[in-house]
Amino acid sequence: GLEDNDDFIPALASTQASFSSHYLKKLLAERGWQYLDGLETGEPNGYAWVQTGDLDNLGHKQQLKMPQYIEQVLDDVVARIRGLLDAGWKRIKIVTDHGWLWVPDGLPKGEIHKSLGTNRQRRCAILKSNAQYDGLVVPWFWNPSVSIAMAPGISGYVSGDHYNHGGLSLQECLTPVLNVRNAQ
């Protein structure tokens, strides 16, 4: 990540370009991985990257209603896995990029003065280089010289959310890895 980062987007070390899906696909291809889009099944004897099940966007969009859609999303994930197994894939590793919080009564409101941060997200904020914050401050994974102020507990710096992520609760940080093997 860049020193003056204010958008939580990592940068490629070699070019300083913002990392994007374009670079993900390019780097996967350089390493011999396939990027499978939609219902593509690719070459089962190789390696592939598949994205499916969009709980994150659904949560941000639906907020309070999000739980109504979880079963359908999981059914879609199962269907995608079955399609890959039926196409001949022997092993599938299922991971997620982060967990999330859903609170029926809404996340409580946390406070951070606007003058301290360059980007105030729901559950964390990028601090200005000279800012002092009384709460928990952690280094950004992509650039440890960038400081991130964490909202306390399950609160958010922006009010009105029932669903969100970006904090340090167990639900947001625990990302299980599931390994599926074709029994045939």
Name each model feature, range by range.
Residues G1-Q184:
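Feature captures the catalytic ectodomains and active-site-proximal regions of enzymes
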